């Protein structure tokens, strides 16, 4: 892939160009470590790092042009500077163009919401593949291009990485891209240049208030996906809404796309006629626009009833055959770290789940309670450098819904883990008789404590990290996997 620099400059008519425009651009990057010969280097000003400081390094590695907001005293030899008011906005224009707008060539399905995105997108991918399409997926756990899998670092990558990934999907012959679309990505315009065909809203509950500040701002960020759904030239855009979530009624009024709805009410396009939740599976009978769907699912939990309905809405919007949808749903056995049962030969049930929001924790605790014959344990913490308002809320939910609560660390990041736990404990002061609260900041120790103390018929929910295989502690990241800790404990009864 290459473009003439002059053609990129046509997108930035207000830019001041210092140097020759007669150059060929072979790559676009905002990471100085990724610069190659012929790169356009984008100098971004971040919260802690200013990309302008790496301009000289980028020049040494072969950058031939750079987007800047500030012109340095000494312009690197051979580098054309393109001075703009906002390099981030310029990046949003230039990058999709450089990669020939891959998000307009693929059929794009975006799933947004606080919870349920990963499960929903993974099921959609499998259904589309069963229907004969080549499919890419971008999500929290990984990025998939047909059968090629790479680890993901953000729910939605930055603009450059995202466009590069979509371009790779086009090169691999993909028909579809299924994406988890985060509120950060929408607010920061990471999805610039992408034209979605179908968008699904799972739910909106408290999360990311460290970034959005208010729930209204958070909802409005999610709403952008639907407000701009009909932008562009693709026909027949579809929006799928969970009408049991209050935000859906508001956002629905902001889209001009075709609308499909799901929820408990029989006035929805998709609604449950009956469902039975069992410890390891559930039966679900749904009414849909193409008739009843009778499902025997290998996943469980009322929250998954909603995920399944949202998936069906998207797939019916894409005209996928009902029988294909049902066959994939019946065979789907979940994704790592989403209400994942851990079997290590123990006499009780252990569940690992990514729940890290009040709503997510409430949902999985209620499902865990429904399958608990003994005591319900929960081991959880809250992430550092993130929304601290949810910490007491999660503590209160744990106390309400579990019998034995073990409060520990999640990813404390730069915060003191003990102070995070202190904030959770503001909701754990008045412990009812018969319930027990334990505080162990070492996550391995906390998990092992629950594993050692639980009795037959108990259920242990280890919440917060799910699929993650790391823990972020101040200035270092260590290997840590909740499931591995359980397996190791039961292999030699020690941690």
What are these language model-derived features?
Residues 18-28, 91-94, 157-160, 179-185, ...:
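Short gly/ser/thr-rich secondary-structure transition/capping motifs
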Residues 40, 65, 198, 238, ...:
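Well-ordered beta-strand positions
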């Amino acid at each position: 892939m290459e473009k003439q620099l002059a053609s990129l400059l046509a997108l930035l008519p207000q830019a001041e160009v210092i140097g020759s425009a007669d150059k060929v651009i072979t790559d676009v990057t905002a990471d100085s470590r990724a610069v190659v010969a012929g790169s356009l280097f984008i100098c971004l000003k971040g919260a802690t790092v200013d990309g302008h400081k790496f301009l000289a390094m980028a020049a040494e590695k072969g950058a031939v042009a750079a987007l800047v907001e500030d012109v340095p005293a000494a312009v690197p030899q051979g580098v054309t500077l393109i001075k703009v008011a906002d390099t981030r906005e310029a990046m949003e224009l230039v990058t999709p163009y450089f990669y020939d707008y891959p998000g307009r060539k693929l059929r794009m399905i975006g799933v947004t919401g606080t919870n349920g995105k990963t499960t929903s997108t993974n099921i959609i991918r499998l259904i589309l593949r069963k229907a004969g399409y080549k499919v890419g997926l971008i999500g929290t756990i990984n990025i998939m291009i047909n059968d090629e899998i790479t680890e993901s670092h953000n729910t939605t990558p930055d603009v450059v990485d995202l466009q590069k990934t979509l371009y790779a999907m086009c090169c691999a012959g993909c028909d579809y891209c299924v994406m988890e679309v985060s509120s950060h990505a929408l607010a920061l315009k990471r999805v610039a240049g992408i034209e979605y065909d179908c968008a699904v809203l799972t739910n909106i509950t408290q999360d990311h208030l460290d970034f959005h500040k208010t729930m209204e701002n958070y909802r409005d960020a999610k709403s952008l996906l639907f407000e701009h759904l009909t932008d562009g030239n693709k026909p027949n855009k579809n929006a799928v809404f969970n009408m049991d979530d209050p935000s859906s009624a508001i956002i629905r009024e902001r889209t001009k796309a075709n609308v499909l709805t799901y929820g408990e009410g029989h006035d929805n396009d998709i609604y449950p006629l009956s469902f039975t939740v069992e410890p390891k599976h559930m039966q679900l009978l749904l009414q849909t626009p193409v008739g009843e769907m009778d499902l025997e699912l290998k996943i469980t939990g009322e929250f998954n009833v909603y995920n399944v309905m949202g998936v069906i809405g998207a797939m019916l919007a894409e005209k996928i055959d009902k029988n294909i949808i049902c066959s994939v749903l019946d065979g789907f056995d979940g994704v790592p770290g989403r209400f994942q049962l851990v079997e290590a030969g123990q006499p009780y049930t252990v569940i690992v789940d990514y729940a890290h929001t009040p709503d997510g924790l409430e949902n999985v605790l209620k499902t865990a309670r429904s399958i608990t014959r003994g005591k319900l344990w929960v081991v959880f913490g809250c992430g550092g450098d993130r929304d601290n308002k949810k910490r007491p809320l999660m503590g209160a939910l744990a106390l309400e819904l579990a019998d034995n609560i073990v409060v520990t660390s999640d990813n404390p990041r730069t915060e003191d883990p003990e102070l995070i736990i202190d904030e959770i404990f503001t909701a754990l002061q008045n412990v009812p008789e018969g319930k027990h609260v334990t505080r162990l900041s070492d996550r391995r120790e906390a998990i092992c404590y629950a594993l050692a103390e639980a009795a037959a018929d108990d259920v242990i929910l280890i919440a917060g990290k799910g699929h993650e295989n790391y823990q972020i502690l101040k200035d270092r990241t260590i290997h840590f996997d909740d499931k591995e800790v359980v397996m190791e404990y039961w292999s030699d009864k020690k941690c």
